[in-house]
């Protein structure tokens, strides 16, 4: 059981006999709620790729059905425009879940714009090559990767529909969002590897995520945020 109260004592290290004591009562203390347990993985029948209800989209996948995690989150990601956080183990198919959100966007809005944020340049290169082949050659989406040079990146942002970038590059480009309409025109913001928020580059990642939410509130336009993370 908790004691009825603690005493907080503050003593100055500069002045003699300068101290105070404050009783802190626990009588009406409100404890924080316990962390919610992980979402239970339901025993669902695996969804076939025909659930995409689009012949072109179905050609993007070489497998007949989605895995259990993809099946469970499919409705939340592909059939709604709500913000979504998906925490799942490595190699559980989170990239395909990101693709659900991208396909949803361009099914609803052919002129939409998506930003896909990754933690490092190597992963950005890999995803750019993968999605350029997958989306550009199959369904005609313009996939670009930011370079870090502001002038070139503004041009890439203007013509790109799927923009692959790192947090630091997007931070530089989005700081002057009031003067950059193409930043305001982002409809979907996907953040991969969100568990790195507590790491060395976490502050920049936190800033750009908060900024996108702030932009959305200021221009009164929904910017959907989909966050992907390894299980913590």
Q: What does each model-identified segment do?
A:
Residues 7-11:
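Extracellular recognition modules
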Residues 3-5:
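Extracellular Ig-like/FN3 beta-sandwich strand-entry sites
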Residues 67-232:
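Conserved P-loop/Walker A NTP-binding site and adjacent catalytic elements of P-loop NTPases
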Residues 12-20:
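Short acidic/polar inter-strand loop motif in beta-rich domains
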Residues 38-87:
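Conserved pre-motif I regulatory segment
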Residues 23-32:
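Short beta-strand edge segments in extracellular beta-sheet folds
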Residues 20-24, 128-129:
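Short coil/turn segments at secondary-structure boundaries
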């Amino acid at each position: 059981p908790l004691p009825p109260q603690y005493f907080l004592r503050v003593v100055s290290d500069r002045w003699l006999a300068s101290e105070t004591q404050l009783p802190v009562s626990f009588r009406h203390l409100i404890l924080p709620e316990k962390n919610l347990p992980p979402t239970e993985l339901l025993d669902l029948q695996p969804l076939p790729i025909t659930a995409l209800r689009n012949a072109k989209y179905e050609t993007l996948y070489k497998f007949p059905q989605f895995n259990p995690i993809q099946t469970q989150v499919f409705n939340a990601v592909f059939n709604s425009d709500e913000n979504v956080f998906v925490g799942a183990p490595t190699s559980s198919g989170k990239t395909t879940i990101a693709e659900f959100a991208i396909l949803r966007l361009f099914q609803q809005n052919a002129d939409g714009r998506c930003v896909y944020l990754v933690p490092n340049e190597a992963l950005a290169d890999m995803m750019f090559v993968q999605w350029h082949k997958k989306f550009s050659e199959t369904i005609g989406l313009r996939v670009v990767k930011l370079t870090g040079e502001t002038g070139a990146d503004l041009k890439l942002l203007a013509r790109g529909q799927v923009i692959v970038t790192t947090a630091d590059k997007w931070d530089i480009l989005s700081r002057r969002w009031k003067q950059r309409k193409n930043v305001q025109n982002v409809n979907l913001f996907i953040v991969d590897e969100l568990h790195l928020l507590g790491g060395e580059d976490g502050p920049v990642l936190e800033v750009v995520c908060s900024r996108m939410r702030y932009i959305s509130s200021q221009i009164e336009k929904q910017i959907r945020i989909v966050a992907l993370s390894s299980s913590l």
